[in-house]
């Protein structure tokens, strides 16, 4: 089954380089085999690496966008041909050992940390997606604890610098072999990499500095959204740590089907059925549109499956609500299987006027095979 690398990373096809990197970092932390021991986490981790490997390379990304997985199946190995150094430095520093002299050895882990982004899936009614509007959402996210202001320490106290690691969040162990020596770096077991020790924890948050909260927010859905549209709500993700900024909330939209209308880009599509007499003579009918009832003129001589167009009755163009698509109506012509004697008599007269042959079975010309007397 073909894989969608955008879906694996949980981003849209319009995601920029920074969005891809943030999504990759978040997922890599979550599914790294040294952290996540659940079955399937290692395969998921490999999938995430592969997706970022392709989408972070402009050439490979362009090939994937055009041809799908087939366009990149031979273009990169399953290793890391793309430069992951920046991402790995942040993500894996606490998982892998490093050698003496490496640039990450003295890095402190106690600086501000941005909060995680959150995802919310929202299912819209067909008409809501076309015209947009305000929606009230209930979200759950982490907020900075108001009692300790995010420090995790009991009010009146403050975190202390970890004496084991000196506040770096890392410990080093020198190892000698018959051939060389190197320094192994790992997460400080005393402070778990934070560089700080909380001796008296805040009773409200248990020392975490954050509390889960339920919140109602109002967002505006722009007109013209469709399945897969992603809306970003700034600063409504999880709160940051150690004074870091909050993450963002991403709302992924899906649209319910409509019993009468279909959508093709910015055009609305529907079907109506008319009688053969209406098709021949023409008529004016009231039909449904997304704007409500409107009149549609059926020209005389309309053929089966003809498409009539109502301009500016379609979907507003996303980002430019003044510009709208069209409503395309496919005409289906209802041919009766039985007719009354009076109808038959009139049709036979019409057939004679048109020069059609009639016989024992009725009209033998164009209309003959369509009708039977009741």
UniProtKB/Swiss-Prot annotation:
One Pfam family this sequence matches: DnaJ_C
InterPro entries: DnaJ, DnaJ_C, DnaJ_domain, DnaJ_domain_CS, HSP40/DnaJ_pept-bd, HSP_DnaJ_Cys-rich_dom, HSP_DnaJ_Cys-rich_dom_sf, J_dom_sf
Binding residue positions for Zn(2+) 1: 145, 148, 202, 205
Keyword hit for Lipoprotein: no
ZnF (CR-type) intervals: 132-214
BP-aspect Gene Ontology terms: chaperone cofactor-dependent protein refolding; DNA replication; protein refolding; response to heat
Gene3D superfamilies linked: DnaJ domain, Heat shock protein DnaJ, cysteine-rich domain, Urease metallochaperone UreE, N-terminal domain
Single GO cellular component term: cytoplasm
Coiled coil: none
Domain notes: The J domain is necessary and sufficient to stimulate DnaK ATPase activity. Zinc center 1 plays an important role in the autonomous, DnaK-independent chaperone activity of DnaJ. Zinc center 2 is essential for interaction with DnaK and for DnaJ activity.
Protein name stated in the entry: Chaperone protein DnaJ
Organism, scientific name: Trichodesmium erythraeum (strain IMS101)
